[in-house]
Curated annotation (Swiss-Prot):
It comes from Aeropyrum pernix (strain ATCC 700893 / DSM 11879 / JCM 9820 / NBRC 100138 / K1). Pfam families: Pus10_C, Pus10_THUMP_arc. It catalyses: uridine(54) in tRNA = pseudouridine(54) in tRNA; uridine(55) in tRNA = pseudouridine(55) in tRNA. The gene is pus10. The lineage of its organism: Archaea, Thermoproteota, Thermoprotei, Desulfurococcales, Desulfurococcaceae. Substrate binds at residues 321, 394. This is tRNA pseudouridine synthase Pus10. Residues 76-198 form the THUMP domain. Keywords: Isomerase, RNA-binding, tRNA processing.
Amino acid sequence: MDSRVLESALRALSRYPLCDRCLGRLFARLGRGWSNRERGEAVKRVLVMELHRRVLEGDEAALKTLVSAAPNIGEVARDVVEHLSPGSYREGGPCAVCGGRLESVIASAVEEGYRLLRAYDIERFVVGVRLERGVAMAEEEVKLAAGAGYGESIKAEIRREVGKLLVSRGGVTVDFDSPEATLMVEFPGGGVDIQVNSLLYKARYWKLARNISQAYWPTPEGPRYFSVEQALWPVLKLTGGERLVVHAAGREDVDARMLGSGRPMIVEVKSPRRRRIPLEELEAAANAGGKGLVRFRFETAAKRAEVALYKEETARVRKVYRALVAVEGGVSEVDVEGLRRALEGAVIMQRTPSRVLHRRPDILRRRRLYSLDCSPLEGAPLMECILEAEGGLYIKELVSGDGGRTRPSFAEVLGREAVCIELDVVWVEHEAPAAPG
Ligand SMILES: [Zn+2]
């Protein structure tokens, strides 16, 4: 029986001092249920025994080999070297790969890592490792010298050992599929930091009043409007997060209400410290924050990939609006029938509205108006219209014509000025997209 394990261990130890873990790691895929430290320790003992045997059988070269490798092997070789060749044992340098830091970094990463997992209310985590370049290079050199081919990387060992020891403390588990956080271990520095995944909730909001913005809109004199985002701040407080972001499927004008179906959105809480708050509690906090002006429904947890789906979805989904429209000189039944015939099913050619030109590129969009149903109001030059339109059609401009930038328009068909004085979104099409997995 030849021993390629011993041969490659000797090749590595002839050139590099290696701690038990870093030697054992060269053979990580041999044997089961042992730590690399146990492997390294065992290989060192058997190697010393084998060299000792050869010396006892008169092999002069074996004694030279043993004496010269002893500093790299370490303490376990001391007694036999001193016995065979008194006074020739020398202390070796620190481990060529880990600098002797591996044990202590693993131990301290577990301490600090556990504290962080608890502080951020994490149950499912993964461990990542940031390796200094020098360590990776030393690891490659030693692997090359040993030529073993059954090893694993120091990164893999740190990840596994830290993960295993954290799990053994209880209350946490390694989860590669849906971790709540990643612990990053610096090696050999030993620092640990935590990347906490956001909380994501599928939800809906209703804006029951006008002049409410979707995003928080700060000015030196305080917020410009009350906002959907601001209404959600109690959720931020409840979860102990650092920041809250609303990913809504589109947005209505500040002065439009959002009624009916409500608008789908994903609420994101960044760096939360409390993750397991029941949806009903979050919803109650949000509704308290909405002060009766904004209502919320929290539906389920969401996945990160669904954020993009919600945002993409906004572009073309159907929406139903209620508009209160003032018409110069009043409106008759003949007018509303004329509007319906001219515009229902029509493709509206719309240049970017002049009111948003300062922040949006000037493009031409084509959006279909699926249906239009207007009723004149008694005793006033007003009509109430229910419109179903392709997402992205600007309704106020469809009414006014925006100086000819939107065609056709209510004003163009009627031959008189028309202005949308109230707008409500009453329904937003929503496929409830779900990310795979
Ligand atoms: Zn080492």
